[in-house]
Amino acid sequence: MLSTRFLNKVLKGAFFNIQIMVKYKIDFILFLMEREMSKKTAKKKNVMVEENKVDKLLTTVFGDPQKKVLRRLQRKVDEINNLSEKYKKMSDEKLKEAFKKLKKSLSKKDLDDILPDVFALVREASTRVLGMRHFDVQLIGGMVLHEGKVAEMKTGEGKTLVATLPVSLNAMEGRGVHVVTVNDYLAQRDASWMGNLYDFLGLSVGVIINEASFIFDPEYDNEEHEDENMRKLRPATRKEAYAADITYGTN
């Protein structure tokens, strides 16, 4: 008959062997996983290298697409700058009349045709009404937005002012332009702040927020409002605000 001590030794030995086998299998599985991951990483690196080669080849043959876009936009900036003196010499009334004439010219032209004139005119109007003149880089930002692309700008780089360029241009078609901001306060602030410029150009401005809607009215004065700029926002129906040439709202 087998002793208890002998059986314990046998069981311990068997358990020890099982541990070794399990550890060996786990180590082997980990080895296979690492090898597979290394292969995938190598493949990705090879793909990236090949893509870089293709990009370099395309750039060599066709040129850097981003630089091409910037060169094209810079030519427009130069054209706008050349027109600046023309609008600078005009009186306020002449400037307003020039905006109306450009608007009427859309029956024979498209927006891209009149963009340089409109941008130059709006920049001059902004200088007079708001005391702010668009920089060249802001003109580029305005053109990028007009083309339906995304213009990335940091806080303080003048997004609100930049928007006045494509907004004024596209509002000339009379189909309504919507400007979307991130909250109710900014929608009201930007509409009030830029409303003076749009009003100078003969464009109406509406605001639609969660619980109210307004029309920018230079003759209206809500003395109860702490922000002096927002005092010109007259309560209106949502329909009236939507019918404005330019409507500010939130996302």
Predicted regions and their residues:
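Conserved RecA-like helicase motor-core motifs
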Residues: G202-A212
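Conserved lysine of the Walker
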Residues: K159
